[in-house]
């Protein structure tokens, strides 16, 4: 409203004043004394010229005033355009200011959100660091247990290798005995060409040899029976091992140890049987040396010798088959040991992962009462299952008598206490 009022006043101020009033203002004005100022016109001859000159000056003044009014109008329009442009620029700047303020507010909210996310990430990093430290401690304890188990396994393997070497030595002795028997057979053939007497004594000696052969056959049948028992025990052991793996991997370790001891006992029994057979062979060798001078080439003795030779060949083949079966059993036992080691490693890995998952859940949730001791240590599970549930295990430090709630805490404390 003030702008329109000022505009109207400005237009009225620059309007040209024409007509008689303007002429009157030009021709005469009031003097300071209140009297009208009259033009001192000359005489009648100079009045038209003066009037003409005054009119021309008045016209020039009007033209000048008109030009100045035109210039003022143009300046006024320029001023109005400038004010409109300033107003538009102000509105644009106000809009930009509002947008900038909204942007600042949004950036402030995003900054707060990012700050919260940063704090949450820092908390998660701290949690992961604690989990990583706990995993390192668990890894150290598992490594110690694996080292002890590997030591036990190496000790059992060394015992098995010693037993295998003894068995190979016995087989070498058996081969040496067979070589000696072949030498005796060649000597018998030589003596068979030289002697042709004492048929009755040879018959009696043949009967004694037959008795020895019967004893040898009985011993061979006994060994076959023991081999069959060993095979049945092995199949039963394999079935029990398979069932035991499905039911309990940790319990199968001790069961496998007992079965390994049974196999060692059976192997020792087989070695004792081989030693007894070697003694029988030695006795037969002594008897052959004693009766070497009285042997002759009679058909009956030759037939008995052929029968003895055939029985000896059959016995040697049976011994070779027994050795092959023994090697096959040894390979199967080694295969079972490898499978057992793999299953044990996978069981330990799954137990470790399950323990880590439980710990992660316990850390993320509210604090809970301490878990039972039989759940804290996966390797101590079989012994704790056999113990009565009413008697809690004693996790006590042997150095400072510190009572730990579980096996993991006890292992960590013992390592720190020793250091």
UniProtKB/Swiss-Prot annotation:
Q: What subcellular locations does the record give?
A: Cytoplasm; Nucleus
Region annotation (Interaction with CHUK/IKBKB) ranges: 44-111
| Tissue spec | Heart, brain, placenta, lung, liver, skeletal muscle, kidney and pancreas.
Q: Which PROSITE patterns match?
A: ZF_CCHC_NOA (PS51801)
What ranges does the record give for the region Required for interaction with TNFAIP3, renumbered to this chain? 251-419
Q: List every stretch annotated Interaction with TANK.
A: 150-257
Instruction: Specify the effect of residue 277 to A.
Output: Partial abolition of sumoylation. Abolishes sumoylation and IKK activation
Q: What is the effect of changing residue 304 to A?
A: Impairs tandem ubiquitin binding
- Outline the segment boundaries, as ranges, of region: Self-association: 246-365
Q: What is the effect of changing residue 304 to A?
A: Complete loss of cleavage by HAV protease 3c
Q: Write one Pfam family the protein is assigned to.
A: NEMO
PTM per Swiss-Prot/TrEMBL: Phosphorylation at Ser-68 attenuates aminoterminal homodimerization.
Q: What is known of its domains?
A: The leucine-zipper domain and the CCHC NOA-type zinc-fingers constitute the UBAN region and are essential for polyubiquitin binding and for the activation of IRF3.
Question: What protein am I looking at?
Answer: NF-kappa-B essential modulator
User: What is the protein's species of origin?
Assistant: Homo sapiens
* Source organism phylogeny: Eukaryota, Metazoa, Chordata, Craniata, Vertebrata
Q: What gene does this protein come from?
A: IKBKG
């Amino acid at each position: 409203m003030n702008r329109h009022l000022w505009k109207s006043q400005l237009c009225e101020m620059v309007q040209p004043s024409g007509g008689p009033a303007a002429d009157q203002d030009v021709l005469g004005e009031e003097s300071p004394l209140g009297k009208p100022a009259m033009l001192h016109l000359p005489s009648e001859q100079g009045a038209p010229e003066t009037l003409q000159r005054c009119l021309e000056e008045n016209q020039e003044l009007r033209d000048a005033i008109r030009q100045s009014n035109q210039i003022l109008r143009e300046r006024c329009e320029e001023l109005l355009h400038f004010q409109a442009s300033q107003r538009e620029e102000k509105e644009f700047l106000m809009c930009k200011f509002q947008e900038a303020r909204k942007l600042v507010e949004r950036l402030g909210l995003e900054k707060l959100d990012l700050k919260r996310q940063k704090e949450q990430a820092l908390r998660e990093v701290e949690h992961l660091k604690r989990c990583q430290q706990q995993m390192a401690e668990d890894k150290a304890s598992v490594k110690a247990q694996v080292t002890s188990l590997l030591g036990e396994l190496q000790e059992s393997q060394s015992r098995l290798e010693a037993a295998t070497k003894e068995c190979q030595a016995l087989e070498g002795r058996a081969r040496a005995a067979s070589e000696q028997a072949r030498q005796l057979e060649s000597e018998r053939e030589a003596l068979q060409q030289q002697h042709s007497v004492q048929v009755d004594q040879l018959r009696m000696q043949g009967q004694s040899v037959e008795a020895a052969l019967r004893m040898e056959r009985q011993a061979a049948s006994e060994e076959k029976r023991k081999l069959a028992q060993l095979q049945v025990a092995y199949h039963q052991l394999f079935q029990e091992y398979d069932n035991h793996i499905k039911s309990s991997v940790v319990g199968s370790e001790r069961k496998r140890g007992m079965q390994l001891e049974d196999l060692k006992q059976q192997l020792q029994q087989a070695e004792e049987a081989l030693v007894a057979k070697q003694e029988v062979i030695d006795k037969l060798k002594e008897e052959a040396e004693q009766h070497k001078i009285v042997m002759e080439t009679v058909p009956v003795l030759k037939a008995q010798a052929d029968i003895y030779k055939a029985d000896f060949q059959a016995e040697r083949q049976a011994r070779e088959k027994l050795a092959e079966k023994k090697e096959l059993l040894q390979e199967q036992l080694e295969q079972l040991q490898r499978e057992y080691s793999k299953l044990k490693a996978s069981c330990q890995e799954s137990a470790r992962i399950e323990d880590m998952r439980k710990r992660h859940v316990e850390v993320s949730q509210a604090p809970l009462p301490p878990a039972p001791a039989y759940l804290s240590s996966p390797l101590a599970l079989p012994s704790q299952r056999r113990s009565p549930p009413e008697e809690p295990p004693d996790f006590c430090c042997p150095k400072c008598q510190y009572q730990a709630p579980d096996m993991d805490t006890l292992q960590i404390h013992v390592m720190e206490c020793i250091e």
